[in-house]
Amino acid sequence: MINVFTRQGCPQCERTKNLMKAKGIEFNVVDITDDDKMAEALKRQGYRQLPVVMTETEAWSGFNPQKIAEVAKNGTKANSTQG
C-alpha cells in the first residue's frame, strides 16, 4: 500500500492526492499536521518538503507527476530507474 504523508494547508499535498485519485491509485493519507514526532522522523530521513509518498519500493517528496504516472502504470511499485 502507498502512504502519503501530508499536512493541512499544503498545496503540493492536495495536488498529489488529487492526481493519484484521478489515476485510480489507492493510498493511505497520513496527516502529520499535529504529529511533530513523525515530521521530525521524515526530516531525519532527508525529506525536506511534503508530501512524502512511500510505495513498496521507493519514496519521494513533493508533487511529482512523473512518479505518480509510473505508479499508475506499474501498480504500487514505481519504476526504480532514476531519470
What positions do the PLM features span?
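ATP/adenylate-binding site constellation spanning eukaryotic-like Ser/Thr protein kinases
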Residues: 7, 35, 47, 65
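Short, flexible helix/strand-to-coil boundary loops that buttress conserved ligand/catalytic motifs
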Residues: 17, 64, 72
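Thiol-based oxidoreductase modules, predominantly thioredoxin-like and allied folds used
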Residues: 25-38, 49
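A short, hydrophobic beta-strand/beta-hairpin element that forms part of a small beta-sheet core
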Residues: 51-61
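Short acidic DE-rich linear segments
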Residues: 76-83
